[in-house]
Regions:
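A short, N-terminal "cap"/entry segment at the start of jelly-roll beta-barrel domains
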Residues: 2-56, 128-201, 297-298
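Short consensus segments that form the blades of beta-propeller domains
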Residues: 203-205
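Generic N-terminal amphipathic/basic segments
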Residues: 1-48, 61-66, 71-75, 80-101, ...
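A cross-kingdom feature marking solvent-exposed beta-strand/loop segments within repeated
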Residues: 51-70, 82-121, 193-200, 224-259, ...
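C-terminal functional regions that serve as terminal interaction/effector modules
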Residues: 2-28, 79-80, 211-298
Length: 298
């Protein structure tokens, strides 16, 4: 990893993985498949990891998305300025403008779209009905290894409520991306890249015990993934060098070494997804932009 990468200061990046068996990465190229759900003014694609489900929506004015008895908090990411979403949840309502991220509490909720644009929705796999819609659900018929059971983080200060934050946050020296968290997710909207990434400045690293979802919103990325070698040759896996256009989701398993390289000549935008939130990122002062609203576990 480049020493200029803020993540180089994290202790976990120097650790040696102790896992002995390994699962494959997952790749969902939404642009190559029909939507999993078609509704009025709304096309939805779903794919999943061990703990999370990601939904990608192409939406037009009048589109409606609802959840009844949603078991836990979920995420609504609005990357486009042309989209506005009215969110109703448990008798409360809030209008969220485009270029925002919102967190919606458990219970009954409804999203109504004005304008045209994209939505990225994130749920835990406690939403079993959404798991069943995922294009790669069969890959998780048996739980993947090296990942502890999901445990939510504490409720927000002041209790459950619809919360929203602008994505318009300038880059800052020493801070990694633009990170928000809730009780169920951590989302990092990485700096947009223009053109292919410099091959001399990649950032290979690994995670010991959690998956990473890397959602390509714009452009294209090649995900380079290498699994550790152990004494057991039967556990070895070939490297992945997977080209994914957008929209797409790569799910990177622990403890594989990985890095993603922007490939397109224009805009390349990647969003990293973790469920539950990452403790190491949360411990870095100033990295989580809404840390005052969502406490860490005691």
């Amino acid at each position: 990893m480049s020493t200029s990468d803020p993540r180089a200061s994290l202790a976990a990046y120097a650790a040696t993985p102790s896992a002995q068996t390994f699962d494959a990465a997952e790749y969902a190229r939404f642009y190559e498949q029909p939507p999993n759900v078609k509704a009025f003014a709304l096309d939805l694609w779903y794919a999943r990891g061990q703990n999370f489900v990601v939904g990608y929506a192409d939406a037009q004015s009048g589109a409606c998305f609802s959840r009844l008895a949603q078991p836990d908090e979920y995420v609504v990411l609005l990357p486009d300025a042309t989209t506005t979403v009215s969110i109703k949840c448990n008798g409360n309502s809030r209008t969220v403008e485009g270029e925002s991220i919102a967190f919606v509490p458990a219970g009954d909720s409804e999203l109504r779209v004005s304008g045209v644009g994209r939505l990225i929705l994130m749920f835990t796999t406690r939403s079993e009905d959404l798991c069943a819609l995922c294009s790669n659900n069969a890959s998780y018929r048996l739980p993947h290894g090296n990942i502890p059971p999901f445990a939510p983080w504490p409720e927000p200060v002041g209790g459950p409520a619809i919360r929203a934050y602008s994505l318009d946050v300038p880059d800052e020296e020493g801070r990694f991306g633009r990170i928000w968290r809730c009780s169920t997710f951590m989302v990092n909207v990485l700096p947009a890249q223009q053109g292919p990434r410099d091959v001399t400045k990649l950032s290979p690293h690994h995670h010991d015990s959690f998956e990473q979802g890397s959602f390509a919103l714009d452009g294209a990325f090649t995900h380079h993934i290498r699994w550790p070698w152990t004494a057991n040759l039967n556990a070895w896996r070939k490297d992945d060098h997977e080209y994914c256009g957008s929209p797409s989701l790569a799910v990177i398993p622990p403890p594989a070494i990985h890095t993603s390289r922007a490939m397109a000549s224009g805009l390349n935008q990647l969003i990293d997804i973790f469920s539950p939130p990452r403790k190491d990122f949360s411990e870095k002062q100033g990295w989580v932009l809404n840390a005052e609203d969502y406490p860490m576990p005691a």
